[in-house]
């Protein structure tokens, strides 16, 4: 009876009237997929039961379904045409072949450590540009921002030769010394207190006018003669008051008749 039951093929319904006996002794080894002694003796193939058929349902016993033979290496280690659920864990592919295959996530990638900064050499540094010089002052029409022009004059050198003379002879402004504006310039000497805001040929005080510092000026016919000083210098009050040296105010150059 046991031989007839063992010879029954897997999946074949038992004949009516025949009673299914409990599992053979060879099937109690614990391995669900291993062939029994009777089946190997009769030359039959091992019985791989499926979950759809339950032959022991009538007897009340539930038999575990046999799982197919596992494949090695796991299926995730090969490129898959379609995504399939693999029973292998995330580390199975690494253990099988030594390196990850297929779909790897950012969590499995090794952490990237930042490289230390290397000091920039002379070739990597930007070319230094020369600093721009001070910007020129904006052009202004105000007279205070403009310096007076220096005109060459015989016997007088220096920055303020045209505006103020060391002997205070030109304490008053000349016609070309202040062409546009009235610059306040003080002279050194006894006439230092005198400032000339306007081109008026006057001195600071009567005592300064009587001294030899300030000279009287008279009107010139042309700016050239006024600049040369031929007609600007006149006799001083002290010189005119000296006895024994008669000088004419109209003709200062004709001292001796």
From Swiss-Prot:
Residues 1-164, 225-257 are annotated as: Disordered. Residues 10-28 have a biased composition (Basic and acidic residues). Residues 54-65, 144-162 have a biased composition (Basic residues). Residues 125-139 have a biased composition (Pro residues). This is Uncharacterized protein C10orf95. It comes from Homo sapiens. The gene is C10orf95.
């Amino acid at each position: 009876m046991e031989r007839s039951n063992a010879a029954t093929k897997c999946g074949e319904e038992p004949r009516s009237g025949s009673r299914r006996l409990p599992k053979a002794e060879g099937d109690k080894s614990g391995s669900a997929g291993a062939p029994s002694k009777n089946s190997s003796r009769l030359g039959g193939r091992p019985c791989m039961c499926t979950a759809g058929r339950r032959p022991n349902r009538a007897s009340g016993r539930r038999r575990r379904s046999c799982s197919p033979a596992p494949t090695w290496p796991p299926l995730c280690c090969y490129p898959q045409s379609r995504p399939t659920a693999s029973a292998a864990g995330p580390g199975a592919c690494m253990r099988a072949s030594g390196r990850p295959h297929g779909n790897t996530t950012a969590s499995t990638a090794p952490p990237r450590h930042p490289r230390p900064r290397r000091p920039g050499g002379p070739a990597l540094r930007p070319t230094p540009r020369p600093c721009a010089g001070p910007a020129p002052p904006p052009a202004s029409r105000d007279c205070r921002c403009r310096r007076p022009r220096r005109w060459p004059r015989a016997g007088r050198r220096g920055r303020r030769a045209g505006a103020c003379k060391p002997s205070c002879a030109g304490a008053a402004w000349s016609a070309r010394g202040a062409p546009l504006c009235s610059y306040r310039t003080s002279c050194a000497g006894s006439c230092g207190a005198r400032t000339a805001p306007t081109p008026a040929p006057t001195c600071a005080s009567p005592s300064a006018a009587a001294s030899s510092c300030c000279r009287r000026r008279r009107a010139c016919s042309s700016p050239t003669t006024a600049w040369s000083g031929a007609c600007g210098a006149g006799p001083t009050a002290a010189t005119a008051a000296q006895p024994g040296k008669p000088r004419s105010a109209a003709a200062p150059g004709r001292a001796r008749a």
